[in-house]
A protein has these predicted regions:
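Surface-exposed extracellular loop regions of Gram-negative outer-membrane beta-barrel proteins
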Residues: 47, 104-106, 169, 179, ...
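Exposed loop/turn and edge beta-strand positions of beta-sandwich/beta-sheet ligand-binding modules
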Residues: 21, 78, 143, 183-185, ...
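Surface-exposed loop and edge beta-strand positions of immunoglobulin-like domains
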Residues: 138, 192, 206, 238-240, ...
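Surface-exposed loop/turn segments flanking beta-strands in extracellular/periplasmic regions
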Residues: 2-8, 56-67, 103-133, 182, ...
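Feature captures outer-membrane beta-barrel proteins of Gram-negative bacteria and organelles
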Residues: 185-193
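Face-selective signature of the C-terminal outer-membrane beta-barrel domain
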Residues: 14-174, 178, 194, 299-306, ...
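Outer membrane beta-barrel strand-and-loop segments of large Gram-negative receptors
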Residues: 77-83, 234, 238, 253-319
Length: 319
């Protein structure tokens, strides 16, 4: 508000363009002994560009520009994966393979504000503002060799064991330079036991590594907060991971009447990732994705989905 009872008006113009494409394919060959070779590839690209301009609407009907924000990014991803599956013994098979992924982000951000200084046509005729990490190229090369063993112990029990080793290199160039290597070992055990045809017990143990969103590395626009025009990037961001311990029991009601399940699980988080305060002053409010440390989470969950057969409405499910 311009005064106690005097409203002020602003207008924003936010044109943008988006384009994307993806191509992929797979091939599978089965040998005479029953073994299988599979390979696949995926290549995609996402191009985004937006320009945000804000104008003060003056009392006489004219307008005065006070913000120019231009964001352009190109995200490319290329993945290739190959694996070989063979039968070991009766009820057991083993799949071994490797995956390679390349991800590239080119990001550019320009901010112009009304104020004292030399205006620039490339900044909408406003005064250019310096933004840390505004022009950046980020590239990741990741390899994942893996082995997956499936064992049908008997007609009621099965066990899946997988071992994955993830190694990656992330290099950032442009306004900032940073190059880092990450290595993670990701085991998984998934045990299932059909106590009865209706009652199943599942025990799961695994290590989960959450991939970093490349947009968190670079400065970006913030269209949800008028008090903060840009979101800061974090060149030192690390992937977070957690150990997952999960015990699940599921009971299927007779006559396909529904499902009741109980789930108890624990997460042990490391380098947990969320937005953190990186404001430089009380008037320059900023946030960025960051690693906040370790923690534990316990969850007990009960679920039920029941068909309303007793009300002669078998197609209605109450959850």
């Amino acid at each position: 508000l311009g005064g106690a009872n005097t409203p002020s008006w602003e207008r924003e113009d936010i044109p943008g363009t988006k384009s994307n494409w993806e191509i992929g394919g797979d091939y599978e060959y089965q040998f005479n002994n029953g073994s299988r070779f599979k390979t696949l590839f995926i290549s995609n690209e996402n191009d985004n560009a937006t320009t945000r301009e804000r104008f003060d609407v003056l009392a006489g009907g004219g307008e005065e520009k006070n913000l120019y924000l231009n964001m352009a990014s190109v995200l490319k991803e290329r993945i290739v994966r190959g694996s070989y599956t063979m039968d070991l013994f009766d009820g057991q098979d083993l799949e071994i393979g490797i995956e390679r992924a390349q991800t590239i982000l080119d990001s550019n951000l320009r901010l112009g504000l009304a104020g004292t200084g030399l205006p620039s046509a490339s900044h909408g005729g406003l005064v250019p503002e310096d933004i840390s990490n505004a022009n950046t190229n980020v590239e990741e090369i990741r390899y994942e060799p893996f082995a997956i063993h499936n064992w049908r112990i008997n007609s009621r029990m099965s066990l899946e064991t997988s071992l994955v080793y993830e190694t990656s290199e992330i290099e950032q160039t442009g306004d900032l330079y940073n190059k880092r290597d990450f290595n993670f070992f990701r085991p998984k055990l998934d045990y299932r036991f059909d106590i009865t045809p209706q009652l199943q017990l599942r025990a799961l143990f695994e290590k989960i590594v959450r991939q970093i969103s490349f947009s968190d590395f670079v400065a970006a626009t913030d269209s949800d907060d008028n008090d903060s025009n840009t979101l800061a990037g974090n060149a030192d961001l690390r992937p977070d991971y957690w150990w997952n311990y999960n015990l699940l029991a599921e009971y299927r009601l007779p006559s396909d009447a529904g499902v009741v399940s109980a789930n108890l699980y624990k997460h042990e988080h490391r380098d947990f990732r969320q937005r953190i305060d990186v404001s430089t002053s009380d008037t320059d409010l900023r946030s960025a994705a960051g690693n906040v440390g370790s923690g534990e989470m316990w969850v007990a969950e009960l679920k039920a989905s029941v068909r309303l057969n007793m009300l002669s409405m078998p197609n209605v499910v109450l959850t």
